[in-house]
């Protein structure tokens, strides 16, 4: 190496580095960005513009596919692979225009995107701002009509908008959960492509999309109430008030900003005026007038029209998780609405107030079937309640069960004296059952409805019937207390008689009355197993108006933030 002159040394080093140079070049070639479609491609002869649009559609499809759906900084296409398939099958001919003119299907599709909120959808999800710019430009500027790049861009955006709306109207945007029971094995990508092609052939864009919507009464009633809601709604982003908030200055600042948006506070930083604004707001919204910031006031402030619209969107999508048709008989329990409905052949046979679980002991969402009824039931306290309430109570006072009217038994059913147990050693449960005997004071009341579920919950009467007079009834340990339990029981018994085979003896309502009069415990099988749907529907449509329920478990808020938090107001 010492005898090597500088030139020889240079070439030796280059020979060593050359392979790495080649590899680097190859890697950089693989990272070359796809060719971007032109922003402008003017065609002066109208008869030739469709050919240029087809050429640009091929380039645009390739670019979007390789660029993972991104067309430019403001346009993202969610169905790039399907778009390529659709346009490739049509030799990349434009779908929505011809000879510098939109066809009728384009006008219909654009109108649907514009009116997406009427379906509980967000126009921005279907690139409405970019489409609006192109459509308005075409209408006002003849030079725009000669720009084949604009026609190609709009064409692919309209097709993507159809596919997006079709998916969202059919399946919704919520991820399936543990109670989702619809079967969508047939709803594949090819389903939406075929549906799109049929819509074009029949020139019925709106009808084809509306055909995909649920036909369930709850969905159609809520959707029908959206126009009236939008007519009076002020859809604009609002300051969100975080509560509780350890930073009192920050809390006051957020409240002041929100009240200012509502026109109730003008002077920033004036504590006296802010208190007055809070009082004024509380009075207008039927909140106890205190001038102080509390949970009810904050919940109301955060319930802006934009937040309400997002709740509508969430709840419309909840219906899309149900089967296309419901059974001809079923029990529908809506937790935030605090009601139970019994439907029989599309007729509301019974509606009852209910009491549901507290936020800390929520009633679970589930689907099941009524299996039997029990008169004068005893209550075996669930493990969850033992851990949260009973065990801490016993560790403080061994007479806790006696005061509650409960008894303690071992696995053989023998009663155990609470004073004989060292409760301090138990942390995660106890090897005993805690039971409340049957009777008028039993928490289950005098009748219980059983249905199979993994949560050990059921529906029942209650010894606290005064709860039904309250407007907010999230008060139980998780089971559903039914005010009209007697009417529900009579329906189930009569229903069994109607569906029984000839000459088959069935249970009679007179027998139920006798059991209850004698205060006897009996298990009454239900032969016609009526389905039970326990669901969380935060708003419903009633007589053309949206009725919003208190978001008792914050489920609407959670889903709105998860799926729709960054949606722009359009």
Specify the residue positions occupied by each region the protein language model found.
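N-terminal secretory signal peptides that target proteins for export/translocation
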Residues: 1-14
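Sec-dependent signal peptide recognition
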Residues: 15-22
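C-terminal motif of bacterial Sec signal peptides marking the signal peptidase cleavage site
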Residues: 25-28
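Cationic-aromatic interfacial patches
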Residues: 30-189
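Well-ordered beta-sheet/strand-loop patches within structured domains
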Residues: 30-90, 163, 183, 200-570
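Long, highly charged low-complexity segments enriched in Glu/Asp and Lys/Arg with interspersed Ser/Thr
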Residues: 193-195
